[in-house]
C-alpha cells in the first residue's frame, strides 16, 4: 500500500485498493463516497453509539516520489509509511480481527479511509463526512464518536483538536513596465505590506494559537510590475 502514490486530491488508486481489502475481509456496505472516502461498516447489536475509526489515505509526497521500500534492521522505510499509511493498515487489521472473531460491539463500527487530510487538502474528507462543506448527503453515516489514527506513538489519546483555517489570497493590479509605468500599484508591494502586518498579530498563549504565511508567488521578471501576487 505504501507504494501506491497518493498525494492529496489524487488518492483514487489507494482508495480502490482499500475498498478491495474492505470487501475481502467482510465489512458491510463498502463504498467510496462522492469525495473519495472509503467506508465500510461492521454492524453492532443496535444498543449503542456508532463509532468511526479513521485513517487518512493521502500523503505529503508529490507525484513522482520514489516509493521504494527499504528495510534496515527491524524497521521498514518508505515515504508516507508513517503518515499515515501504517494507520490504514492498522485499521484494516482491527476490522479483520473483529470479523474473524465475530466480535460485535453494541454500536456500529464504521471504518473510514478519508481523503485530503494533508496541507491544501484541508481535511476535505472529514469535513464532507460531517457536513462542514455543505455538500454532505444521505450517503454520510450517522456518527456518534470519531477516532483518528494518525500518530506513530502509543500510550495516549488526544481528545481535543486544534481548529484550523486556511486562506488563499490574491492581490491584483493592471501590471506594467517598471520604468514606463513606475508608480502604479504593485500587487507584490501590497502583499509584502500585508504580510508585515500579519507578523505583528498578537495571539494568546492559552489556548495555543499560531499563524503562518507559508507560500508566496508573483511576478514574471525583474523589470515588470506584476499584475498579480
Regions found by a protein language model. Name each.
Residues 44-49, 163-164, 223-229:
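A short, glycine/Asx- and small/polar-enriched loop/turn
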Residues 16-19, 88-96, 127-130, 168, ...:
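Predominant activation on well-ordered alpha-helical scaffold segments within soluble catalytic domains
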Residues 1-79:
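Acidic/His- and Gly-rich active-site-bordering loop/insert found
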Residues 181-225:
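Acidic-enriched catalytic cores of C-N bond-cleaving enzymes acting on peptides and small amides
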Residues 75, 80, 84-164:
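Acidic/histidine-rich catalytic neighborhood of metal-dependent amide-processing enzymes
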Amino acid at each position: 500500500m505504501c507504494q501506491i502514490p497518493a498525494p492529496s486530491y489524487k488518492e483514487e488508486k489507494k482508495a480502490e485498493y482499500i475498498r478491495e481489502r474492505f470487501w475481502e475481509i467482510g465489512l458491510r456496505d463498502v463504498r467510496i463516497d462522492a469525495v473519495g472516502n472509503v467506508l465500510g461498516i461492521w454492524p453492532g447489536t443496535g444498543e449503542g453509539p456508532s463509532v468511526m475509526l479513521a485513517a487518512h489515505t493521502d500523503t505529503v509526497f508529490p507525484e513522482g516520489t520514489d516509493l521504494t521500500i527499504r528495510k534496515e534492521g527491524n524497521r521498514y522505510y518508505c515515504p508516507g509509511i508513517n503518515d499515515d499509511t501504517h494507520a490504514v493498515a492498522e485499521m484494516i487489521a482491527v476490522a479483520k480481527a473483529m470479523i474473524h472473531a465475530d466480535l460485535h460491539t453494541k454500536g456500529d463500527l464504521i471504518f473510514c479511509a478519508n481523503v485530503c487530510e494533508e496541507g491544501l487538502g484541508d481535511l476535505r474528507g472529514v469535513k464532507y463526512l460531517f457536513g462542514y462543506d455543505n455538500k454532505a448527503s444521505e450517503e454520510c453515516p450517522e456518527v456518534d464518536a470519531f477516532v483518528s489514527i494518525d500518530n506513530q506513538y502509543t500510550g495516549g489519546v488526544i481528545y481535543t483538536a486544534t481548529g484550523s483555517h486556511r486562506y488563499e489570497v490574491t492581490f491584483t493590479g493592471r501590471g506594467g513596465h517598471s520604468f514606463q509605468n513606475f508608480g502604479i500599484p504593485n500587487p507584490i508591494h501590497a502583499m509584502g505590506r500585508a504580510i508585515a502586518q500579519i507578523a505583528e498579530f498578537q495571539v494568546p498563549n492559552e489556548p495555543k494559537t499560531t499563524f503562518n504565511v507559508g507560500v508566496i508567488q508573483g511576478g514574471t521578471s525583474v523589470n515588470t510590475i506584476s499584475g498579480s501576487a
